[in-house]
Amino acid sequence: MKKIEVVAAIIHDDEGRIFATQRGYGDYKDGWEFPGGKMEPGETPEEALKREIWEELETKIVVERLVQTVEYDYPQLANGRACSRSEDSKHTLVSSHLTAAFHLKMHCFLCSIESGSLVLKEHEAAKWLSKDQLDSVDWLPADKVVVEKLK
């Protein structure tokens, strides 16, 4: 099974809102996620996250702390998205009862904006969401695990 390791930014503002982005490409187009991307060889998760957010949003961030590492087996899209999960303190393993297309390991960090204006270069939409609004968008499965922890 293909394994992908990524980083994701849970960007918050002074009002406690969280920045969510809508994917503009790929198999999971239109799903909502925390912005971020794949780590390159030799990068720390924090370095990768700063690079990805600059590339995707033209924004410099401060990486504050690791919130959670999620491991998720994404099923073949034709089979749907049924899954079960088990949790411990900082790791969540979500395993599908279906054939997995790939295994995702996503390191999610709480971040704030240092400078920049959040220009959407790869996403089709974005929203600032209060905690009460977190369920108002259709989160991708791995991101949904993190959303539950943030509530």
Label every PLM stretch briefly.
Residues 1-18, 38:
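Conserved N-terminal beta-strand and adjoining loop/helix that marks the start
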Residues 3, 28, 103-105:
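Residue-level preference for beta-strand/loop junctions
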Residues 11, 45-53, 66, 126:
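Hydrophobic packing within well-folded, soluble alpha/beta domains
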Residues 13, 60, 71-80, 84, ...:
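Active-site-adjacent beta-strand/loop module that shapes the phosphate/pyrophosphate-binding cleft
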Residues 17-55, 59:
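Conserved Nudix-box catalytic region and its N-terminal flanking loop in Nudix hydrolases
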Residues 58-60, 64-67, 103, 123, ...:
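Intrinsically disordered, low-complexity, charged terminal extensions of DNA damage-control enzymes
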Residues 85-90:
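Intrinsically disordered, low-complexity segments enriched in serine/threonine/proline/glycine
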Residues 110, 118-150:
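NUDIX/MutT-family hydrolases
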